[in-house]
Amino acid sequence: MKRKVVRLSTLFALFSFVGTFSAQEKKKDSIKENSIGEVVIVAFGKQKKEEITGSIQELKPKDISALQNGNVLQGLAGRVAGVQIVGSGQPGSSPSIRMRGIGSINASSEPLIVLDGIPYPGSLNSIPSSDIESLSFLEDASSNALYGSRGANGVIIITTKKGTRKGIHVDFDIKTGINFRATPEYDIITSPAEYYLAYFNRVRVGEKASGKTDAQAYTEAINKMNATLGYNAYNVPFNQLINPDGSFNQNAKLLYQDNWQKLLFRPNLRQEANLSFTANTDKLKAYTSLGYLNDRSYLIGSGFKRLSLRSNLEYALNEKLKFGVNLNYSNSEQNLGDGGSFANSFQFSRNIAPFYPVYLRDNDYNRVYDIKGRAVYDYGDGKGPNGARRSYAVFENPVGNRQYDLNKVTNNTVNTNLFVQYKFLKDFDFTYNFGGVIINSQELVYGNPLGGTTATVGGRLAKSNTLKYAFNHQQLLSYNKQLGSHNISVLLGHELNQEKSDYFGARKEKLFLEGLTVFDNVLKMNEIPGNQYDYAVEGFFSRVLYNYKNKYFFNASLRRDGSSVFSKESRWGTFYGLGAAWDISKEDFLKDSETVNALKVKASYGQQGNDIFYFPGTTDRIYYAYKNLYKVSNFGDDTPVVTTEYLGNNKLRWENSQNLNAGFETALFNRRLSINAEYFERKVSDMIYRAALPFSNVGYYPRLENIGNMRNRGVQVSISGDVVKTSDFTWNLYANLTHYKNKITKLPDAQRENGIADGLFLLKEGSDRYAYYLKEFAGVNPLNGDALWYKDGVDAKGKAVKQVTNSYAEATLYQTGKSAIPKVYGGFGTQIRFKNITLSANFAYQLGGWGYDQNYRSLLHSDNYASNYHRDVHNTWTPENPTASLPRIDISNSNQNASSTLFLVKSDYLSLQDLTLSVGIPQKFLENYGIRDANIYVTGNNLFLLSKRRGYDPRLSISGVSETYGYNLLSSVSLGLNLKF
């Protein structure tokens, strides 16, 4: 009997096709059946897809094979329904992930990561994507309930490969490519002449606005250029650079020009190779792999290297007893980008004026070299030509820093999972799982003594070592029974998860020899920090699965958790999940339909908890939320000084998340079209936030309290279908869309009316978490170029009205009605195969949100120092351009570009996430070499971005605020070869 297999990709939100179906063209009854034995990874086991009552989406190796990321989650934007992924260009970095909205304000909103059934506390950059068999995204309560206190923000279950193919197989994959910067820089000034003119005009316009004549304004502008800018890149004096008519002196000759961005950002090499062996016999399943990755970034001196080894073994001693072990070792080295300071390469190269040199020059403008023949870098500290000194970022030079400094993290990770399973009394089995993770993390930070801020102390060396242990014990007793048309499965379990971390570091200053990174080479002790923590969570849980005639499905889960984060009075919490589904397509009235091949409706509800809280304003976790934390300092006289770092709260309790999910799944037209639509509602109660404290308590982190409630409500739909499907040609399309609204539903009585100001946002009942709270820009005064804003006032009749003011201090802060939360987000893509040639493309998008472009604002500054401008500075108000939409920018009034709605920008975007062309090598060329299958491919990631403003990348921030110190995303293009033996 001839069969056709229709494969529909598992993909994402609002229109989410999930899975692979089998269809038989000729036999009508077979069309109604899902693929026999098709299972999905769920909490503490597997389930047939048809039995799922909640929201679970699964990605397989074919869905992630095109990714070129040290962390597999980094490249999945737009690939999973309801999931937002915000990444970084730093190779090996972990992205921020949000499932179905915002899970918390001050607690974690990140999902739980489970690796081979065990919660994983490490970074996923230790695991090559080639080792992954599946990624399951659990988004609703019935799916997450068994993870209790850790499942509130969703769960991602990662399952590594086993020896599932019969016989012995060898797979080898190698690819080499280029990494380069994904997004262009803002449209900044790059010409020294253009900058000098822009600065001159900013001063001139400001002086004229203050009442000076043209001649006086010209003279004052020239004098301030000479006094402020410091460096003159031309062969004529400052007072001759610009003519009295405001034009640039055409006789001025440029003496030098260094391009900061070209020296910092260069295409670099990427190399990856993975070798795996699989074996499968009646008793043994084995998978062993060796992986190598060298992911050099386009930012000089930055990158990620990894060497990994994995061995997964499973052995059935007899029909009753089975055991297995998963072993993974990873050694990684991550050379980091710059932190949040003037030395940050992205911030610095964007804002440094283009006439400032990278390299030090003498009075004749020749480069200066040291005794080793190396070019000396210019740090703007008065050593430049004729004693020139910068007015911006003195003692900083990121090109020099990245040449001589080090910021390296080396991780050694050992991960061991063991299990023993014993079946008894026909319908029972008992499983013991053990997971152990040991992570040794060593950080080395070296600041050179040659130049920059560390040179002022003779160089600096800091080293630290963090040793982290995590152990997980699970005991699972299950019962499975079929009684006629009734099927029941019961699970009882206990889990104990323990973590311990010990951190120790030291920092010294004043190096004896340059470049030698051992403490014996450094003379002066600076500090020796250290800390440790212990964390434990214990849970008792149960689950009941029931179905009748494989048409009506029900499940119930219950878990009782205790966490060491809380005091004894608040330590334990109870969490649950309920789910039901009805496979309508198996009913008599629909089973003979030639159009509807599958139709299932489902609903679930439940409650999970959250015990991951942060010190306010940081991403440092609080492990003892109920205790006061202290710091002991010594100021050199052996007298201890004890300061309070954090005020504990022994009444602090769990954040609770109540999740409702309802939807349907259907397959139509001989399973050529698949649709999944779901409605969801997440309510967060007892939300954690920092408390308002008396002024006397200022000086340490404020206390955390359970202050309010929040809600996320939305829909997600995915659709996937085969446009064409023949033996030689297939064409598949998919699309997904997610929409949700966030709303704060309860705050303490003291903050209920006015809300809580939180930076650019206002936390207020009825508003969403990222609702902007800003002064409203009212335009430009055409007479003098003053920026205008609105303020609350009253008219002649005493009626409240908005009035216009040029005083920023008088302007009123308003709820703008604009939010950083997009109206919709998702992805779409296609795969086309013609014989042995396959082309696939995946896109991501978001629409309807707003960003706050802090970078753009800083490039239209009014400060009296020489940082760069956006070219829109030419479109600001001047006497010659009185109708400009941007206000006068001068150095006499810093409020002209003060924070307001002027700097809100639409955060819509469309990005090409990956594009792959693969060509299979015909078998006739392989058979004499023992090669079973081979293909050559070209793949690219992050190849294209459309956004509202050049340089602004909405993909870098969940809050919508442009990342001043962010690491721009990385593009990769590689050529690869895959061989199967």
Where are these regions (language model features)?
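Short, small/polar-rich motifs associated with maturation and membrane association
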Residues: 1-310, 315-318, 322-330, 339-345, ...
